[in-house]
């Protein structure tokens, strides 16, 4: 009987230990979590400073180097967030909560689709001015990487505990990232493209600081139900992300409308410095 009791206690104790153990990212997605956000901003900003501005239309490969990394990071990161939240599909929830989580999942997949669409749009358009080069190689990477990075490292999307999760110094870093997103959108409306490289370089520094903080801290557990201010912070980040991505979608539709007469879009020009 003693052996049987020991075996039973072992079998019942093992699942609780597994549940209590912090979740580590699978090795297959570590490059996405660590390398992608940094290189997705660093490579495009190098493309802004190294080649001559007129070489982009002569060599489409330079366009691809500037556009592909941030779009690919965003296109991959959001499906990983969607797939990493299996409880949303198997845990019974009230109808209102189920609808909200369905909209959340649909938005994540829409962000990924917009990122893929951006690859075709921004490599198709002509980079015929310094303004367009600045938008595509400095502003666009920040607008694509920062929302994906914030939602994946600073927010919990688990049903019942959805909210903002960072604390201490990370809150300041996140606040600066949100400020950069708002500043980038505002400067684009004001056509102040000369400030775009500063937005990009600042984003690069903040992403690197966040990666160093995350690599030296303990893995995050699933949090308890978040207080109201953390939910409000998540709503702010997610709402700003929606505005950013649907602004990019609008610009993609304008580009396609300029290149394809049959496309249902009316755009006055293909100058990317028009208001998004």
Swiss-Prot record:
Residues 1-24 are annotated as: Disordered. InterPro entries: UPF0328. It holds the Pfam family DUF2463. Belongs to the UPF0328 family. This is UPF0328 protein ECU04_0100. It comes from Encephalitozoon cuniculi (strain GB-M1) (Microsporidian parasite).
């Amino acid at each position: 009987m003693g052996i049987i009791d020991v075996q039973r206690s072992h079998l019942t104790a093992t699942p609780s230990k597994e549940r209590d153990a912090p979740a580590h990212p699978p090795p297959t997605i570590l490059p996405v979590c660590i390398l992608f956000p940094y290189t997705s901003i660093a490579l495009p900003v190098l493309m802004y400073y190294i080649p001559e501005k007129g070489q982009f239309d002569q060599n489409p490969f330079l366009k691809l180097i500037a556009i592909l990394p941030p779009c690919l990071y965003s296109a991959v990161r959001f499906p990983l967030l969607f797939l990493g939240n299996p409880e949303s599909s198997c845990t019974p929830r009230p109808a209102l909560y189920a609808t909200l989580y369905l909209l959340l999942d649909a938005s994540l997949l829409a962000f990924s689709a917009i990122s893929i669409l951006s690859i075709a749009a921004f490599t198709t358009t002509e980079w015929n001015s310094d303004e367009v080069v600045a938008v595509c190689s400095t502003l666009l990477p920040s607008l694509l990487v920062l929302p994906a990075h914030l939602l994946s490292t600073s927010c919990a999307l688990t049903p019942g505990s959805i909210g903002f999760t960072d604390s201490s110094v990370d809150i300041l870093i996140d606040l600066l990232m949100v400020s950069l997103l708002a500043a980038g959108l505002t400067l684009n409306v004001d056509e102040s493209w000369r400030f775009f490289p500063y937005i990009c370089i600042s984003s690069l520094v903040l992403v690197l600081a966040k990666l160093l903080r995350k690599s030296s801290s303990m893995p995050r557990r699933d949090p308890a139900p978040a207080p109201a201010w953390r939910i409000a912070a998540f709503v702010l980040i997610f709402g700003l992300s929606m505005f950013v991505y649907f602004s990019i979608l609008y610009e993609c539709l304008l580009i396609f409308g300029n290149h394809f007469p049959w496309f249902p879009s009316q755009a006055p020009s293909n100058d990317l410095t028009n208001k998004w």
